[in-house]
Every structure is written in C-alpha cells, then in structure tokens.
Amino acid sequence: MKKRVFSTLTTLALSLSLAFGQESPSEEDFYKIVTPPVPEGVLLEVGGMVTLPDGRLAVATRRGDVWMLDNPSGPKPYFRKFASGLHEILGLAYQNGALICAQRGELTKLIDKDHDGKADTYETIYAWPLSAHYHEYSFGPKIAPDGSFFVSGNVAFGDEEWWAGESRRPLRGWIFKISPEGQMEPWATGVRSPCGLGMIDGELFYDDNQGDWIGSGGIWHAKKGAFMGHPAGLKWANALPGSPIKITQEQVYATVDPRKTRDKNGNAIKPENVQNEKFLTLADMKKKYPETQLPAVWLPHGILGVSNAEIIADQTNGNFGPFNGQLFVGDQGQSKVMRVFLEKVKGEYQGAAFDFRSGFQSGVLRMAWANDGGSLYIGETNRGWGSAGDANQGLQRLVWTGKTPFEMKAVRAMPDGFEVEFTLPVDKKSAQNLASYAIRSFTYKYHPVYGSPTVNEAKCAVKGVKVSEDGLKARIIVDNLRETYLHEIKLDGLRSAGLYWSLVHPTAYYTLNQIPDGEKLKLTEVSTKSTAVPTKTTETKTTAKAATGKVPTFEEVKPLLAKNTCLACHAVDKRQVGPAYTEVAKRKYSNEKIVELIYNPKPQNWPDYATPMAPMPQVPRDEALKIAAWINSLAPKSAPKP
C-alpha cells in the first residue's frame, strides 16, 4: 500500500513538474509558414494579390507582370503569365470576371475576352497625373459595397528638402473613389504613404507609415472629408472639383510650425526632434479642427512594424484560429503580420493591436485568403525598401495547425479600465495577482520631423482585477486612463490553466480614443492581492558587470535592445531595415556619438537605406551608453604589428 501511494505521489509530482516547468509554445507551434516552389526565372516582387472564385490566385508584380496560379495551395502550383508591360502594380482586385489593378498613373481593367488564359484587353478606367518622382506609388483598388474602387496616392519628396512630403500633382496624398464608369470622387486627404487599404464591414480603413507629420504607423478609419494629418495633400483641397475637405494647409502651418528654415548660406535645414519642447499632438489638432481623424489604432513604430501594409479581415469562421472578425496587418519592413481587435465606442473606432507571426522570408506587402478556408497567402518584396528576412521577394502561405494558442483574444475598454478576453482559460492564481499586470500610456508629437519619440509617458496603476468563473476574461481597474493615448498592457505574469503556459504575445497596445460610459467595478468585488515577482539573479549580475565599465556581451545587452525596439530594424551582422551593428561599428563613432545619433539620427549618413531612423530620446542614457559600448566592441580588431 505504501509503495502504491509513493508511486502515485511520484507520478503526480512529475506531472506537475512537466506542466509547470515545460517551455511555453511559440508562434510557429500554431501557425506554419509554407513556401511553394516558384519556376526558375519568375520574379515575384508581389505588389498585388487576389484569390479568384475558382480558387486560382492572381499575383501582380512590381515589375508589371500578372501571374495566374493554378492549384496555389498545392505542392506544385502551376504559373501562367496573364498580363505584362504594366507600371509598378501595387494592388489587385477581381470584379465580374476581370482583374482591376492600380498602376502608377491609372486604374486598369484586365480582361481575357477569348478565354485563352491571357489578358487581351487593357482598359483604362481612370488616369491621374504624375510628376515622375520615385515615391509617387499608387495603391489599390479596394472594392466598395456599391462596386466602385478606392485608390490611394503616395506623396513625393522635395528635391532640396528631401525629407519633406510634397503633393506635386493632384491626388498625391489623397484617397479617392472611382466609379466603374471612370468618374473620380475625392474622398479624404492627409495621407503620406497609404500602402494598406481595407474594406471592413463595408467601411474603408487604411494604414500609414511613420514619417514627417506621422508620429508612428497606425490604422485610420477613412471617412469621407477626413484629414488624416499630413498637410501636403491640402494643397488641392480647394482646387479639386468635388473636394469634401474644409481644412487648409495654411491653417495647419499656422497651428504647427512647418520649420522651413534656412542656414546663413540659404540651404534648407532638415527639422530635427527638439527635446523638452512644447508640442502639439494629433488629438490637439482635432480639438481645433474636428475633421482631423485620429488613428483607430496606433501601431507603435519598431514594435508593431515599421512599414505597415495590407489590411485584411478574418472571415474564415474559425478555420484560421480563434480570431474570426479581427484584422491582420502586414508589415513590409519587419516581414511579419500583426493582429488588431477593433470596437466602436461613442461612434469612433478604437482597439488593441498585438504581434501575431514573424519570420517571413521577405517584406510582407500583400495578403489574400486561400479558398481552402484556413490559410493565408503572403506576397513579399523589399527592393529599394529593405526588410527582415533572407530573400528579396517571394510568395508564402501561413497555415493554422489546428491548435489554439494561449493569447489575449481581445481587449475592450471599460469605464474604469479594460477587460481582457483570452483564447484559453487562465490560471486564476496568476490572473488574480495584480503583479501580473503592468500598464503605461504614451502618445506622439504632431510635427514636421520624421517620426516621433513616445512622449508624455505615464504609469497606470492596476488597482484590482475580477476574473470570470470560466477563466476566459479578466476585468482590470486601471488608474490614470487618458483619452486619445496609447495604453501598453503587459501581462507577463499570467499563465494558462492546466499547462501553465505563458501568453504567446503578452503585450497589447490599446488606443483609447474614447472612455466608454457604464458601471464601474467596486473594490469589494475584485482581487487586490499583489505578490511581486522576484528579480532574477542574472539581471543583478548584468547590472553589476556594466557598472564596472566592462563591455557587455550580446546576451547582456539583448534585453536592452529588445526593450528599446532596436532589434526591430537592426541585426548583429546582417542588413535589415537598418544597417547591421557590425557596419555601424566600422564607422568608429565614439560611444557618446552613438548616443547622440540614437537621440537625433542622421539619415544622410546611410543613403542606401530607404527608411530613416526616428529620433529615440526616450532611451535612458545609461542604457544607450551600454548599447553603444557593445556596438563598438564589434569593430574589427586591428592586426597585430609584426
């Protein structure tokens, strides 16, 4: 009897050890990346992609070709060239048996009239003017419920003021609507690089990239008559027939100095971030000019992408995992896909953004659902732009394994905090511990500088938590909620029930445009227990080593690189969005100079990189110095003298 009891206890202890001690699963355990073979000589710099009703996949390339793929989800898709000779296609749609694409200067219908598998009619639906500047990309179309097409136009940049977005021709910096008969309707302006358009439940959304006047990437609800923030397109607000825009460029410049200054020799001076200055935010602009549209969701630059791209809704009814109805957003620079949960509060969209799946071979520009109901085609390119990954272009497919990841399924705003919904039940002990939660809020400057540091940062104390009986929801009381601010919600201490997994992605970024009305929780109905997580010994050792003046190792500096989003754009010895750290080390900057360049980057120092680094004065000086010392330790050692 004693042996049997001992054996049972031993088995139980082993089971608990395995459950509590095993490594938590990661992204690739739930979503697999499949790379189909591509025929030799076929260059897929994917600019547009759409799945046809019969299951074929149409793929448009930036080099002007359109390929039709039979059996695209199979082991050997068959490629057939459908069209060629087009001008940098950056979007593709299907309507009534024809393909519709956005070239640089026109919306084009491609028709295969004789059904031989090749387009024999290239019909111009609508054309718009160009200045021939390289940055005048045109994106779209997305098909509206009435059958018309939405297209968006990039700004150009100045010849001397190469950092400043310009609208040299009408519709640059605009979103516009085109009827099937070719009638154009100006829709909205204030966009800078609107690469991703998405029709969500019949409403138009778009995403933009960090740059001048755009503090960080984000997703905007593109209402008719809205001004999104970049003033270049306002040049045509009163000149375009049918323009719904009321705000003027002069009004913007009277409110925020465009800083078009010159030195004593008459040369234009590039605006740089000014620390400790008085500044306005986009929310301040909205108070003065109500037509200003705030992002429904900010996508923090360097954390949730650097070059936001395709927006696509999950309409698979659960065949792609537990996120039906949510949005997936591609990122060209970081070669990954993010996930977004949207809700409507007091008439405005807002919501939470999460990481989802990284590790694609090149920049994720376009996405399309496969007809198999449970996988997502990923179209990739990085020529001229740079990206993470080992390839310059390609086509891949993201496939759900059928296993449910432990994730925050949704985050909803509450009158006194947030409600977090999970995909699997939480371990209630960890979920009822306030130390499992950490929340801070911040926003961005609205200014003519390229990007913005995070500003007005503040901690938001978690005062209580109420976990639902089924363990699928945790409602948290949060102090210091701020409307229009981004709220970073970190749940590092939470674990799943049973297997005790960590969240695959423990951080959500909720854009709180409106605090909802409603009943608040009472402190008597929530847990207020807080058991702090002890500091790891290794962290103490790292700090001690750094304090002695020794150069930190990569393992010691890696947490700082991750915390400050450095790894989003840089690798140790490989070019990504930015230069490799080994290349920076070859410049032989002093540690102090590197810190200065972190706070105020000089893009002209790296002319071969398309995406300038944003100012990062929020990096603590002691951490910046440690990072600088480590970078300089990578410099090639001089050969010993004979």
Question: How would you describe each model-predicted region?
Answer:
Residues T538-A562, P642:
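Electrostatic cytochrome c docking/interface patches
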Residues M367, L395, N564-D573, I627-I631:
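The canonical Cys-X-X-Cys-His
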Residues N480, P615-P642:
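C-terminal capping alpha-helices of c-type cytochrome domains
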Residues T401-K428, A435:
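Surface beta-strand/loop "capping" patches
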Residues Q22-P405:
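Beta-propeller domains with acidic blade repeats across secreted/periplasmic ectodomains
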